[in-house]
Amino acid sequence: MRVMAVGVFDLLHAGHLHYLEQSKALGNHLTVVVAHDDTVRVRKHEPVTNHDLRKRMVEGLKPVDEAIVGNSPDVSIFEILPVVNPDIIALGYDQEHAEDSIRQKLNELGYGEIKVTRVEGLSDDLDGTRKIIARVLELSRNKD
């Protein structure tokens, strides 16, 4: 079973690793789509590291079989499906994507056989990049 996971993966942390470990457990091949820099800028924030470096970091993680950079924001994420050819799309616990709307779009595009599942989060206060940055800033302020 081929699994596809998608994310920004800016400043890798334990939450990312947990997401990818759980995603890999769903099948035997994990392809990770690392968000294109322009997509990150449009949907979230200015990335700290560029997509090529984030891809390289993700490729080095044990659960990952393959990592690719995703489409620019003017191209639908669904257009990457023929490249990845997943049986399962694994969503992170904190990703805003609605499973039902993804399933509906998959059906419309003729990919109704692809399963969509959401993996569990890591039970840690510092499981997200923004949380880690906030904690570092807090520690820095308290140091003074």
Predicted regions mapped to residue ranges:
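Nucleotidyltransferase catalytic core that binds NTPs
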Residues: M1-D144
